[in-house]
Amino acid sequence: DAVDRQMRDRLNGGYAEVLPRPGIREQNPHMHLLEACLSLHKVDPDGGHIARAAELVALFETRFTAGPGGLLGERFAPDWSTPTGRDADIVEPGHQFEWVWLLHAYAAATDTPVLPAAATLYDFACATLDDDGRACVEVTREGEPFDGSRRTWSQTEALKAHLSMLESTGDERHAAAACTSFDVLMDEFLTPDGGWIDHYGAEGDILSTFMPASTTYHVVLAFAELIRVMKA
């Protein structure tokens, strides 16, 4: 209720990312709000959370993916039009994957077909993986690397997307892709003492020795999904 009262943008749609309202809009907070709505719906199915989720999915369809190729943009003008320059051309494979998982979760919660956009985002993001199945940070809308470095969280979102595609289609190719993402995480990012290497450069050099707490969320949820889908 507080989010609706204080942060809802009744003119342009969506919600303010922060208060006071910034001069740019972002899909990322809305993505996490959708995830929260879906989680709330599981424990409070009569609480109206799925209606808010539907509004966010509609925003995804009409605004977030309105740019070339139907890909997920990151930052927008206050009215949700796409800015010029860098923000018009750069997309993040990790977030394409994350929305694939969310769209499958939304379809399951509403007993509706998965939106075709999920396949669009998935196919594009998979095409940007390197030969060993690693996801990089940023690419152009043509799929060319822009920031070829690699973060832990992007690999976890690739794993979740592969698992959601496997669950919805039964295609064993997605199981193989999930195994590849799991191997990347275990062999390169997660350390034996329970930590992780959060950021590699494009050439495999370690860029950061810090372990952001936010990454824990991505790792835990990815492994929870792995256990649920693969019965591992």
Predicted region positions:
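Glycan-recognition and catalytic cores of secretory/periplasmic carbohydrate-active enzymes
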Residues: 1-232
